Amino acid sequence: MAGHVSAVDDILAEYHGLEEQMADPALHNDPAAARRVGKRYSELQPIINVHRQLVQVRDDLEAAREMAHEDHEFAAEAERLEVELVELEEKLADLLAPRDEHDGDDIVMEIKAGAGGEEAALFAGDLLRMYQKYADKHGFIIEVLDSAESDLGGVKDITLSIRSRQPSRDGAWSQFKFEGGVHRVQRVPVTESQGRIQTSAAGVLVYPEPDEVEDVEIDEKEIRVDVYRSSGKGGQGVNTTDSAVRITHLPTGIVVTCQKERSQIQNRARAMQVLAARLQALQKEEADAEAAEGRASQIRTMDRSERIRTYNWPENRISDHRIGFKANNLDAVLNGELDDLFTALRAAERAERLEADN
């Protein structure tokens, strides 16, 4: 508990410092700095709120205990406050527990059809809609940066930006970070005339997005920028200028494309943001691998070559192989009902962090 008191004191000091910065009109002359301050402020707010409740309950409990000597009705009030005090202390401990430094970040997500041809692309489309529905229910904004459809309307490859509507302690990364990996589907494809169950797969890549591109060192000499005409379905909305942008990072071979925006300048800026996110993730993976000295990576940075989840259509079952989670509500999950699964994954991650911290 003494450690918690010290941690809260440090957070209170930081919080008051952030309040002073936000009250300074000069801060808003630098939008990037203002975003960083606002984001950190929102991350600390839940801790401050619980701490204030805790202080109030302690004061009320002390008063109730004193009054209980004269009025027995206050004895019952004291018992209620004791229970509330324990609950708040546990809540504060949970908020102060080690957590992923990127949990408040927005993300870049890529969904790619894997083995299985057209069926794999249709499944990738199912995953896309699942994430879109979850995002809608939880107030996240999804923006399509680049996409390629299959002949039957599936998804060959798509790049998304997923962000919070406003700064939050629990941003898009805290929810979607567990989705990186190979997702396997077992079902009868629409292209299968014999009614045989087949197995296909789609890959999902998830990267926390840096607050600013400048946060990641990118040498302009190490990138190649190509421009080309944006694809479209025809009609008046087709962009007939070379506004689409493809950026290749030569040292790593990472290729990023963006064609959503109407201008080449906007597409280049957005592509640079995606490149920064991918390079940041690559740097972290390399650092984690070096620190782990070959140990199996944890949930938050698991090996993307491994199958993480199976979606079994005939049995209406979803299985997450990392934590042994199984549920026979595949239809609900595909409709964006991912809360139970994400809660289980967060609990497993928290347990690993606490074990590593000890």
From Swiss-Prot:
Coiled coil: none
Modified residues (N5-methylglutamine): 236
InterPro entries: PCRF (IPR005139), Pep_chain_release_fac_I (IPR000352), Pep_chain_release_fac_I_sf (IPR045853), Prokaryotic/Mito_RF (IPR050057), RF-1 (IPR004373)
Presence of the UniProt keyword Transferase in the record: no
Any single Gene Ontology cellular-component annotation: cytoplasm
GO molecular function terms attached to this record: translation release factor activity, codon specific
Subcellular location: Cytoplasm
Major localisation: cytoplasm
PTM summary: Methylated by PrmC. Methylation increases the termination efficiency of RF1.
Entry keywords, A to Z: Cytoplasm, Methylation, Protein biosynthesis
Alphabetized Pfam families for the sequence: PCRF (PF03462), RF-1 (PF00472)
Statement: the UniProt record of this protein carries the keyword Lipid biosynthesis: no
Function as written in the Swiss-Prot or TrEMBL entry: Peptide chain release factor 1 directs the termination of translation in response to the peptide chain termination codons UAG and UAA.
Stated family: Belongs to the prokaryotic/mitochondrial release factor family.
Name of protein: Peptide chain release factor 1
